Amino acid sequence: MEPPYSLTAHYDEFQEVKYVSRCGAGGARGASLPPGFPLGAARSATGARSGLPRWNRREVCLLSGLVFAAGLCAILAAMLALKYLGPVAAGGGACPEGCPERKAFARAARFLAANLDASIDPCQDFYSFACGGWLRRHAIPDDKLTYGTIAAIGEQNEERLRRLLARPGGGPGGAAQRKVRAFFRSCLDMREIERLGPRPMLEVIEDCGGWDLGGAEERPGVAARWDLNRLLYKAQGVYSAAALFSLTVSLDDRNSSRYVIRIDQDGLTLPERTLYLAQDEDSEKILAAYRVFMERVLSLLGADAVEQKAQEILQVEQQLANITVSEHDDLRRDVSSMYNKVTLGQLQKITPHLRWKWLLDQIFQEDFSEEEEVVLLATDYMQQVSQLIRSTPHRVLHNYLVWRVVVVLSEHLSPPFREALHELAQEMEGSDKPQELARVCLGQANRHFGMALGALFVHEHFSAASKAKVQQLVEDIKYILGQRLEELDWMDAETRAAARAKLQYMMVMVGYPDFLLKPDAVDKEYEFEVHEKTYFKNILNSIRFSIQLSVKKIRQEVDKSTWLLPPQALNAYYLPNKNQMVFPAGILQPTLYDPDFPQSLNYGGIGTIIGHELTHGYDDWGGQYDRSGNLLHWWTEASYSRFLRKAECIVRLYDNFTVYNQRVNGKHTLGENIADMGGLKLAYHAYQKWVREHGPEHPLPRLKYTHDQLFFIAFAQNWCIKRRSQSIYLQVLTDKHAPEHYRVLGSVSQFEEFGRAFHCPKDSPMNPAHKCSVW
């Protein structure tokens, strides 16, 4: 999901909404007369009754007809009032005090009001206006790097999951449910984990050949016995540790109906290549902390010559960092330029110092031909890796590969290893104390038993009714995008037709995959052994089984309805190579979505996230894929050129934002910024469509904002968040999202309807005269 922001408001400019409640005066006698009922005419008719005997028959008939017509008008007026002035579906209805709808409206009003800072002008700094109250009242918990409104939803989901795991039974049942509970208990059994100490890892290291080529010096005979490919097989094919490069089974970007082996740059421990280059004070500190971490872990494992090993391993990673292309680079955003499909025979010529057929045969348990095709996403990188292998001593390469396995698994060891990891995280991100054990174990259960845990979650915390309502909300927002495509003046007819087709074919997954309702189907996802006293072995069993499932895909038919994340995930995503949007049950929770909240808040909350993911299909990344999820340029050159010019405006806008003296990278964050802006507009216009169809909503109690204003406030309050200063450095360096503050400011300031809703003067910070717009 996403990140933080600020704003300002003159409250005397806000328009209060007046409404007549059917729960008000006269309610005890039944529904009160709706506004517009001709009371005066009724009294006149009644008062004239004494003169009736003197009227002739024609006059009486005429009067009767008028009375009948008046009655019809009254009935029609009542029906219209029920539709437009009475309670709407969002829940403001004719109900007694204390009914669920009223409670939900009151709860929503309290949440919004507590988060606001009414002293700030929304036309100056909307983020600070919308989130100032929240920022004042909340601190970052000691064991967290960030904390925000969405994180609070995560805490609620975590507590629910913990309670489900603590139960001896319950839920849909099945072997997978028993296994995830046993796994969770094994993770909590710190006494047993401490008793074992480093032994589980020492067994893994021995399986990889030990340190220093089994403890021998590099000399004739020993070097000849060493085989890089065998160790790569252990690292990648047994322990799932990316070393030198990554090997994955993925959809073929140019033919998404089949799976393909994909090879890409990888093998660094730190999250960004520039951290190895020590180009500023922050990266120097992080690199020094990483070196200390390496030495400490090596010492805990009883290795010899710890300082020398750490230095040599670090030098290998620094060499890899120097040949790695930054994710900020244009090359890494242009999939077509990266994509290089080659045969195994061709791959062998590109990187002659690796035995590819042998390596892939071992991992996939296949007998590949030299004509088997793989996709190489980093051709230049792999050529340089081959040179690095040739020029690096075997002993050093061996220790690097073993280290990559150690790093992947060290978080599952005894407290001294976990303390070393925490100290590194403390220097990198500023966390004050380690996460409590129960949270750590819940995270591991999510990672290794995601769907089993998800089956428990949706069984109790997400209904079929909620799923249907969100699906309708998605369809409303898709409809608006369809309309928007017809209105864009920069898109020609040919490109517009392809864009419409992509929208029509887009798959939408909401809540959970249907197979979770079938215990037998869930069990098949976890056919490996789990025991309460063998946590580390449980981890290894899970990793090996996951590798087995992955390698089997290479000959399987593609099922594009599969989910990348489990339903309890607090996230949403769009996959361009499937043309698929997914909104898990974990994010469809209050306060992002509540079926009893006003629709202004639902459209401003989850609606803007739905619009965000939908827009990803047409940003600088997703726009490279067609309606079937294939990497295909479906734009005309004229339309694409105009798209790039409009996108450049957004790049310049975000390039001008700074956080802690770090400049936001407008190009690196472009796709997310396009999605934020587009999502806000789509959700807003979808809400206007909803109002036209259902009538205006009742105002929230004790809040004087219109529902258009509440829509924008809800959007901003999605991103109320605090970050530790150290984590902001890494966020700007590595995150494709702009800091949350600017996600809000950048989006609302470029949307004409925001300025109109808050009556912002032209050229005020939130309503500049010149605006950027793509979708």
UniProtKB/Swiss-Prot annotation:
Glycosylation sites (chain numbering): 255, 322, 656
Cofactor stoichiometry and binding remark: Binds 1 zinc ion.
Tissue expression: Highly expressed in the CNS, in particular in putamen, spinal cord, medulla and subthalamic nucleus. A strong signal was also detected in uterine subepithelial cells and around renal blood vessels. Detected at lower levels in amygdala, caudate, thalamus, pancreas and skeletal muscle. Detected at very low levels in substantia nigra, cerebellum, cortex, corpus callosum and hippocampus.
TM spans (from-to): 60-82
Domain Peptidase M13: 98-775
Catalytic EC class: hydrolase
Protein purpose: May contribute to the degradation of peptide hormones and be involved in the inactivation of neuronal peptides.
Family assignment from sequence similarity: Belongs to the peptidase M13 family.
Protein name in the entry: Endothelin-converting enzyme-like 1
Organism for this UniProt entry: Homo sapiens
